[in-house]
Structures are given as C-alpha cells and as structure tokens.
A protein has these predicted regions:
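Short, small/polar residue-rich loop motifs at catalytic or cofactor-binding pockets
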Residues: 89-92, 116, 355-357
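Active-site helix/loop module of the DD-peptidase/beta-lactamase fold
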Residues: 138-176, 203, 232-268, 272
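Active-site-proximal alpha-helical segments within enzyme catalytic domains
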Residues: 220-227, 266, 270-290, 358-374
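Active-site Gly/Thr loop motif
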Residues: 251-254, 306-369
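C-terminal/domain-terminus segments
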Residues: 371-403
Length: 419
C-alpha cells in the first residue's frame, strides 16, 4: 500500500510538472496560441475583432466619387441583374463598378454596406508596391535595384545579399518557404498568426538564385514591409497614412500588428470598406493621380504593371492579364491555381488578388474599375478557385460594349438593399 501511495504521489507530481510546463510554454507566447485556438471558429473576412492589435490609418478628404446620372449611365438593367446574380451566387459581400468617371453600380450583400470593414487578404501587397514608388521618389530608398540587404542587415554575409528590392517586388527572391506547413508549431503558422513576423521571415534562407524563379510568397511581402519600415524610419501604418491614405482614403483603414508596437502584416490584412479599394483602383487607372495631385509617380505605376521576367502575368506585387493561360498558378511550391476559361476581353487588365476572391480589376483601355469582395475561396480537393478569373471582368466589358454599340438610353441605377 505504501508503494502504491508513493507511485500515485510520483504520478501526481509528474502530471503537475507537465501541466506547469505546458502553462509556462503557452504563457510565453499566449497571443499566438490564442489566435491558433480560435482561428477555426471565426470568419476571416468579417470578424474584425479577432485581429488585434490593430493601428488605425486615418483618411483624408479626397474628391467625391461621382455617381452615374441619366447622362453618364453605361450599365444596362440586364447587365446589372446579371452582375447581382453573379455576386450572390459566388458569396460576394460587395460589388462595385466604376466606368468613365462615374460609379455605375454599388451593390452590397445582406448585412453589409459602404461602411463595412472587410479583410483584403493579399490585395494589401499591391498597396505595398505603391508605397515603394513613394519611398523611392522621396529618397528613402535609392532605387528599385538596391540590395535588400542594405536594410535587412541580417543578410549581409550570405547568398541573400544578392537579392534586390526589384527581385522581391517581382516575387523572384529565391528564398525558401517558411517551414512547417500546417503544423501549429511550425514557422509557416507563426508567419501567419505569430507575434514576430519579421523574425520568422528573416530566418528563410536562399534556395534559388535571385531573378530565376517566380515563387509567390507571403514571407517575401512581409519582408518588404520590414524593409519599408527600416528605410523610412517610420512605423508602416504611419508611412501609409502620411503618404497615401491621407490622399486617397475616404474612410479609415486598419493595419494588423503581430504584437503591440510590433510589425504590420504587409502580406495581407489591410481592413477597410470596399469604396477605398475602388479609389485605389482609380488611382492606378489615373497613373498615380488623385484629383490634381500626383500621389504616386506615373513612371512608377508603369513599372508596377510591367510584366516581370519570370512571370508575364505579374508585375510589382500586382497581377496582370497580359498573357493567356488556362490555369494561372502561384509559382514554385504552391499547388493552387486560378482557372481562366478564356482570355480577358481587354489586353491591359491589371488586378489586385486576395484570397477568397478579393479583387480590384483595373482596365485602363475601358476606363473601368471593378471591386469584388466576399467569400468563395479555394477548392482544396482540386487546388482551384471556385470561379473563372476572367468571368466577372468579361461580363462587364461585354455588357458595356453591347450598350455602346446599340446606343441604348439608360435609366440611372439605384442600389439594392442586398440579396
């Protein structure tokens, strides 16, 4: 009996030690483990309270967006109906169409309106590209061909010292992906939800020579945010607000941080209502201008939309429709692809691409910007997204051309109250 009691006491002590070790382990990075434990119970598109801490990026007073009148209306009632049907069928939360200087359509799903904040996912990358043009123009960075190691001094003495900022903007960095896959303790998960995004990203070593392989990577875009912060000497959100959002934003944005006072998530998670994404698309269409002010250098916009050597469908953190491929993939190490059942109707489609089908399409030749936000993401069985990439812009372009050719007179469009 004494032996049994001693064994029981020993087991109790062991269990206590294990529990204490577990509590200590979790407490050492409680914010990460809280995110990890609650992620599968939240809606990543709309549960803004889950993303904390955040920094508010205050807006300015940009020019009003004109709404189409009887004289400027270009969408037929049939096209509006088709677009609303498309939006509802694909789990959309918002769909905006701006054409020839006027907002032709502004649709929101049930429970959403023009003040609703939504997760932008990787569309944020295309905003980072704009900020690089501003930083170079203001002299914070000498040129796009500056070695990244000028700012990432951790790279000075190894093969990564050959990587330029251009390589990173074009996703031709040659870096290995974060390890661990979906292992909750792996670097990949910590890059997504951890509390030291910069530290995790800096661990990645060179795998290929720079400018040889296209490899779309959140890790790369996170490092671009770190470079921008170190080069300017400002927190990312401050530089964004001072140089872009105060010019283009009609309402505030929110930037997610890994921890209080930490690094901004620059591979995704710029939270703002859809109308601000429309304004960013219009800025692109107007070659960097907002009203009478040149906010982003025109020459930089041209560089952003120039096809890169390793992927003709990618410029600087921004996607291009310049070459037709039935399946557009994300490069080395990513199985997912987006189906393209046909070419784009226009040859100059530029678009911001975010997970779950967050899109801003900019088509200068048609004087057209389309914003779509909502659900409808990846089919994990096939590795394909659940809709054709060209379907939405082609639907709009064909409808606009039909109206133009037939010379129809249209009634002003009135926004619906949702599905």
């Amino acid at each position: 009996m004494i032996i049994v009691k001693r064994i029981a006491k020993g087991i109790a002590i062991l269990v206590g030690v294990v529990l204490l070790a577990g509590v200590t382990f979790i407490a050492s990075d409680w914010r990460f483990y809280k995110r990890l434990a609650t992620f599968d119970r939240m809606n990543s598109m709309t549960d803004m309270a889950w993303y904390e801490p955040v920094v508010e990026v205050k807006p300015g007073t940009p020019p009003e967006i004109s709404r189409a009148t009887a004289d400027t209306r270009t969408l037929s009632p049939e096209l509006v109906d088709a677009l609303e049907f498309y939006a509802k069928e694909n789990g959309s939360m918002s769909l905006l169409v701006w054409h020839k200087g006027a907002l032709q359509m502004e649709w929101y799903g049930e429970g959403f309106d023009q003040s609703s904040y939504m997760e932008s996912a990787s569309m944020h990358k295309s905003v980072v590209a704009l900020l690089y043009g501003i930083a170079i123009d203001q002299g914070y960075i000498p040129s796009v061909d500056e070695p990244a190691s000028t700012y990432l001094i951790e790279w000075k003495d190894d093969a990564r010292s050959k990587i330029t900022i251009r390589n990173m903007l074009q996703m031709a960095h040659g870096l290995a992906r974060a390890s661990g896959g979906f292992n909750p303790l792996g670097d990949n998960m910590k890059l997504g939800m951890g509390t030291d995004w910069g530290g995790i990203a800096l661990k990645s070593l060179a795998e290929d020579p720079p400018n040889t392989v296209f490899a779309y990577s959140n890790l790369n875009s996170q490092l671009l945010g770190l470079i921008l912060q170190r080069a300017t000497g400002m927190p990312y959100a401050e530089f964004l607000q001072k140089n872009l959002w105060s010019k283009v934003g009609e309402s505030s944005a929110r930037v997610w941080l890994d921890r209080p006072g930490g690094l901004a998530k620059t591979s995704g998670s710029l939270f703002t209502p859809p109308r601000n994404w429309l304004r960013l698309g219009i800025l692109h269409l107007n070659k960097g201008r907002v009203g009478d002010e040149q906010v982003v250098p025109e020459a930089w916009i041209e560089q952003v939309i120039t096809p890169s050597p390793n992927n003709p469908n990618y410029g600087f953190q921004t996607w291009l429709g310049t070459e037709y491929r039935p399946k557009v993939d994300y490069g080395k190490g990513v199985a997912a692809h987006v189906p393209h059942s046909e070419p784009f109707e226009a040859q100059d489609v530029v678009y911001f691409d975010g997970a779950n089908g967050q899109r801003v399409y900019v088509i200068a030749s048609e004087e057209l910007v389309i914003v779509r936000m909502g659900e409808g993401g990846l089919d994990f069985q096939t590795g394909a997204f659940r809709w054709d990439e060209p379907k939405l812009p082609n639907l709009v372009i064909r409808g606009l051309r039909q109206v133009a050719n037939e010379g129809e007179s249209l009634e002003p469009w009135t926004p619906s109250e949702g599905p």
